[in-house]
Amino acid sequence: MLKLRDWGYQDIHELRDVVPSKRCSCYYADFLAERGRLGVYQDYTRLWWTGAFRGAQPWEDPPSPLPTDEHIDVYCASQAASWIRDDPGGRPFYLQVCFTGPHTPFDAPPDFRSLYKPEEVPLPILAAPDNPVSPQVAQMLKSARLDGMTETHARMMVSHYYAKVTLIDHGVGMVLDALADKGILDDTWVIYTSDHGEMLGDHRLKQKKVFYEGAARIPLIVRPPGGTSARRTKQLTDHVDICASLTEAAGAGAVGESMGRSFVTGTEVVDDDSGKRYVWSEVESYYSMARDDRYKMTVDSASRRPVELYDMLEDPCELANLVFESGHRTVRDRFLEEAFPALGFDAAKLDAFKRRLARGQYRDTFARDLLRRFN
């Protein structure tokens, strides 16, 4: 089995997601144990997990019982800042700081929660998906159990999430301060992004595993060495472009065959609004999505059968699924012919995925239902 060091990582400080336990400890668990706080945190996470399994919703998440400087996300930032300050310098470095938040639980400490009043935050898109509903979305609606969510519930959930995001922002600031204190901030590329978004009540959904904007559209903030004048771009980009950009910034060659397109030249961000024609996203090997500057289409990964089509120009809230509309046949055909072949999905990959499912590595309801469907 390949380990992180086999991929070139030299200094590894691995965390156990948000819930270190007696069976799966980590550096953060040791940190809390040294302060006599591990039991407090484990009691909290046990309470949260029990509630989640019994149907508790994110607006019910209690705040962290730990002070801010002992929260796992601040601990993560503190470790990164210490690494920066202790680094002897004189050599380039790549530092990847992976916060566990703002993933559930939405457990920001009380001082961060106090920054947001539920009655002042915006409401999510409360309209549930209308027919036709894709099998993927139907399953996640069933899993989310938000059909009884009120506006009060929604605002509470959003305010808790905003507080958690602000906690992450605090951690990012700690890392940037360390770079500045070291005198290398203006010599460093800083890229802020995420692996996925959060539905946060939009369409009566939560978390991820769908391709609505709440889950698929994520932040990307790039600061080149020395900074630059602030600007926004609407060009399409995705994670493979970040990889291509980092290797170009480092003066390295391309990483094999890649769909990535660099958005940097030298130490500058390219001022180019042309972007890519298509970007993609996938939920394992269940469903695949492609998007251009106007349309977003989802297909069943195995059969390539279209299940969702949205006109993002006319319907930015994604309320009307046009997948069966005869007037959009040419759009569907274009995506099937131009966009999805690039993903290279085939029967062999599907068979490999089915074998992984059968070994029990995917145990959530969504995966079990799909395994039954595949068989």
Where are the regions that the model predicts?
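Histidine-centered active-site microenvironments of extracellular/periplasmic hydrolases
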Residues: 105-111, 177-228, 238
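A long, amphipathic alpha-helix that forms part
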Residues: 71-88, 123, 146-188, 249, ...
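Beta-strand elements within well-structured catalytic alpha/beta cores of enzymes
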Residues: 92-99, 161, 165-168, 172, ...
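C-terminal cap/loop subdomain of S1 sulfatases and analogous C-terminal strand-loop tails that border
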Residues: 15-24, 34, 196-202, 223, ...
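Long, internal low-complexity/basic segments
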Residues: 146-156, 164, 324-375
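Active-site rim elements
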Residues: 63-71, 151-163, 207, 227-237, ...
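Active-site His/acidic residue clusters
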Residues: 82-127, 142-156, 199
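Catalytic-site neighborhoods of secreted/periplasmic enzymes
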Residues: 1-66
